[in-house]
Structures are given as C-alpha cells and as structure tokens.
Amino acid sequence: MKKSFKIIGLVATIMLSGKLYAQNTDIYKGIEFKMPKVIETSFAANTVSIKDFGGVAGGSVKNTEAFKKAIDVLVKKGGGKLVVPRGLWLTGPIVLQSNINLHVEDGAMIIFSTDKSDYPLVDVSFEGLNTIRCQSPISAKNAKNIAITGKGVIDGSGDAWRAVKKGKLSETEWKKFVASGGIVSKDGKTWYPSESYKKGFEGSSSFNVPDKINKSELESVKDFLRPVMVSIVGCDQVLLDGPTFQNSPAWNLHPLMTSNLILRNLTVRNPWYSQNGDGVDLESCKNVLIYDNTFDVGDDAICIKSGKNEDGRKRGMPTENVIIKNNMVYHGHGGFVIGSEMSGGARNMHISDCTFIGTDIGLRFKTTRGRGGVVENIYIKNIDMINIPTQTIGFNMFYEGASPVLEDGQREEGNKAPEKIFAVTEETPVFRNIYFKNITATNSDEAITLFGLAEMNLKNIVIEDSQFETKKGLSIVDADGIQLKNVKLKYSEGTGATIYNSKNIDLQGLQLESIHKPTIKIVGAKTSAVKLPKDVKGEQLSISKETAKNAVK
C-alpha cells in the first residue's frame, strides 16, 4: 500500500510541475538548434454560427451541407470563425479552406456519420505510401491560415470502421460489438464491421491498400480503407488549440508536408484496442510546436514520420525544426516515436518535460532495412516515465524484421550461422547524434535497448544525468559511440548490461545496482574499445571467447 501511495504521489507531483512549467516558460527556451519562430494564424473578425446555415443539433440530422455553406460564405468574406455551439452535431466530411477557424465551443460535439457512402475514395498518403483510401472526416489541402479551436469534442465514429479482436475486449464489450451488427470471423476471435471490410482484410498482407485486389475493385472493399480523422496536407500556418479529438477510424491527427504548425491544449483519445489508433503522426513537416497536450490512444502517441521506402525517399522531405514540450501520455504503443516510416529523414527536434504513464514503450525509435533516411540531431530531456511494460528507451533498426538474439546458448561459439552481410545503399537507414538528459523511469520492465545494424551502426548516442529502476538492464547491439554519463540503473533480473558487436562504448559513468552482483556481458568478434565502470571486475564481467582480449579498456 505504501508503494502505491508513493507512485500516486510521484504522478501528482509530475503533473503539477508540468502545469507550472507550461505557464511560465517560453516555448523556444533551451532549444539546442537554430529554428525560425513558427508563424501563427490570424483571422478576420467575421463570425458565423452553423445555425445560420440551417444547422440542426441533436445528433440525428446530417449537417454536411450546412458546414459547406458556412465555410464557403466565410471564404468569400475573407475568412473568419465558424462557431459550432453546444449540442450534438452529426455530419459527413468537413473540408477546411484558407483563413477558416472552425471553433467548437465547450459542450459542442461534432459526430461524424457512420454511413460509408459519405466518404468517397480519394488519393492520399497513408503509412508513408501514396495510396487510395476513404476521404477523411476533416481535411485541408494546400490551405493557408486555418485552425480548429474551442473546448468541444470531435468524434470520428471509429468503432464503425475498425475490426476488433476478442482478446482485447471484456466479455461485455465483445457482446456489444457483436450485437451492433457486422461479421464475426469463423474462429470467433475477430469482429469485422462489414463484409466489405472482411474482404479487404483477407485481400491484404498489410493494413494499407489490399495488394491482392485490383484498383478497379477497391470500391468493393471500401470499408477496409479507413481514413485518418484529421488530414492536413500541404498547408501553412495551422493551429489546433483546445478540442478533444477522439475515436478516429485510423490515425487521429495527420499533418503531412505542412509548415508553421501548432498543436496545443489538445486531448487526443482512442480506445486502447484501436488498430492504427495513433495520436498525432507528424509527417514531412517543418517548423512545428506541440505542447500542453494529453494523449491516451491505441497506437503510437506522438509519432514522427517522413514517408516509406522509395515513396519517402523520392519525396525527400524530412520532418524538421520541431519542439515538443509538456505533454502527458497514458496508453500508447510509444510515448514519443520516430519511425518506422522515416525514409525522408528527421532532424532538429527538441523533446522535453513530458510524462509517460503506462505507455507500452517510452521513447521509441524504429526502422528497418529498405527504409533509408537519416535521423539526426534529436535532443530529449526531462522525461518522466512510470509503469512502462517494455523498454523505457528503445532503438530497433530491425522493425518488421528479425532482431538479434542475445540470450545464453543462442550464440554459442562454433554453433552459430554466419551473419549475412548487407551493403550500404540509399535503402540503409541512419540514426545518429541523439542525446538524452535527465530521463527518469521507475516500476518498468526494461531500461534501454540500442539495436543498430551491422552495416550501419547506431552512432553517437549519449545518455546523461538519468536514472532507471527496471526489471531488466541495458542492451547495446551494433552501435558505435555510445556514452553513459552519470546514469544510475537499478535492475532485478538478468545481466546489467550486454554489449554485442559494438565499439567506442563508454560506460564509465554507469552505476549498476542489483539484488544480485551487477554484471556486464561483452559478446561478439567486432566488439572493441569498451570502457567499463571501475567497480565492475572479476566474476561480474563476462567476455566471450570470440571477443578480442583488448576489447575492454
């Protein structure tokens, strides 16, 4: 009981300190790179209400035409504010135009129609690829000076779009889905919202466009082609300030190739079981502020992307000049994430003063061979994490592929398959120059995993002034230039630190603490130039036979 009170107290302290920080600190203070100030939105004094154009509250009458008329009239006047007052407002897709501020008042709720005929198939980019999907509930393309503001709620009716696995639901929740209609799989483990969705799912090897179905047949699997809820493409001067965005069909917020973007004071929610239920996916954007938001979602919370494979490399637009401060993340596959679709690169990012509570992975970096792209100059500090069920910091350059295995007996000398050698090409991803400072994690599973590639090591990763209290310790694989300075790691299971085929590893500033004797394992013929803590010696140090005798300094 005392431990529970301590954890609750820690969370409360973190939340309170975060609020104070947000109220008193310049958002640009402490940035490690040169960044132009984000150009903010400004609107004409014109104000209209959706009611002025025949809008009807109550949640049963579609207001699609009323929204369109109101926006068209405001555009002709030079722009302004479209007010959605208190009430339930059912509608089909809303298309924002330049100089429009969609203002959803406190007590107002925009609910998007579950009628799939309201959402025609359109050309989009999803998961980093050019493709075809249903039109988004809210969209803007090549617009300038647009906003969604207010304290209301915007609901994408995502439950009508998504398949759900029985194992992710309670018995009561499962029965509710089955009773709503749709189709249950033959094995009784999955609920599909429609036959169209089921056909698309069965004709696809991914959650993107069904690759086993011709383009001419896409209409027959339309329900499977779920849209992101808010699609902002090629826009400039964009503000999202205040609303709750929830229950999206796929990703919640997707700014793409957009500049001068501000996301603040938002609540972004999705059921934890929602497939592709990301919070915000920032893709090939520049000059961005994301601060004072709360995320509780079904997939990655704050995710950085820049296109996938050849499509992303041809686009050649990195996500850059981004400040992310004072955000709270509850459930999500990752709190802050880069990848895996990062083929255009990512650079110049500052992430600080964020709290992750129960997030699957805290700080997550993922890619794989074939992506290409360079991720560099990422600065992360003042991050607090609690109850993280996997890694608090995790780099995985084998995402969607086979990761190296470091368990005892699975890399026995003389009894292992030779490593395949890959050439370095434009398809080789690069992660380098990433800095962590003042990271705190407690009551979590694993502290740090740094998994690079044999042909392209993780390079220049620095962690300092940080402390971790986890079950498992630290793993470094195929890395070059890793430095830990004033890092305390208290762990309870296995090896404190494992280093495999890595070089220029400086752990002199690592303090290990365990109920057992803290141990470090050095493995791999390519391992060299390793500096260890002075107090690790004798039986606390294990060096494999294949590792050079002079690998440890």
What kind of region is each of these model predictions?
Residues 2-83, 88-101, 105-234, 241, ...:
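Extracellular "leader-to-stem" segments immediately downstream of a signal peptide or signal-anchor
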Residues 56-57, 309-313, 344-345, 371:
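Short, small-residue-enriched loops and turns at beta-alpha junctions
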Residues 79, 90-93, 113-114, 134, ...:
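Short glycine/acidic-rich loop motifs that flank beta-strands on beta-rich extracellular proteins
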Residues 88, 257, 267, 306-308, ...:
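Active-site-proximal loop/turn and secondary-structure-junction residues that shape catalytic pockets
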Residues 106-107, 144-152, 236-246, 259-271, ...:
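Right-handed parallel beta-helix
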Residues 217-219, 277-279, 311-314, 369, ...:
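Outer-membrane beta-barrel domain signature
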Residues 342, 362-382, 387-553:
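Extracellular beta-rich repeat passengers
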